[in-house]
Amino acid sequence: RTLQATMPKIKIVETIWDTDKYPRASVYAQQTDLAKMHCTGDWLLYLQTDEVIHEKYLPEIKSACEKYVADQRVEGFIFRFEHFWGDFSHVNRSHNFYPYEMRIARNLPQIHSWRDAQSFRIFSQGDEFLPDYFVKEGTRKLRAVQLDAEVYHYGWARHPATMNSKN
């Protein structure tokens, strides 16, 4: 709340995580949709807590958002992903790790987070909260432009002291 007091654009939204109603990690998608309801801009930048974008990519991102804001054919932007593994110096590029993913989507009511909030899809059903975030029928992928920018994913990395304590 201290950060919110100094930065008025930050809004803290208190929620309840209902894992019974939204099973199989779809509660992440439901919570993403809940946050989306509080957004007001043309584009939504979505990062999970273990993801960051280096500031060197900000000019590319800003330029693309400005260039395509009036082009309704573009519904989102795809980023390359670097998955750090074990520590902060090693990257895993095996087939088990997604090399690209959407992290910017248009702020449209028919665009919803999908599955476990890994990506976004257009849903023909425009409800605020969907009964099943894993359904493919009646949905489609967003039309997207790939950016020359990366998301660094640290979900599988640990501080060296933590890794050394495992020995």
Task: Give the ranges of each region predicted by the language model.
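Acidic donor-binding segment of Leloir-type glycosyltransferases
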Residues: 1-23
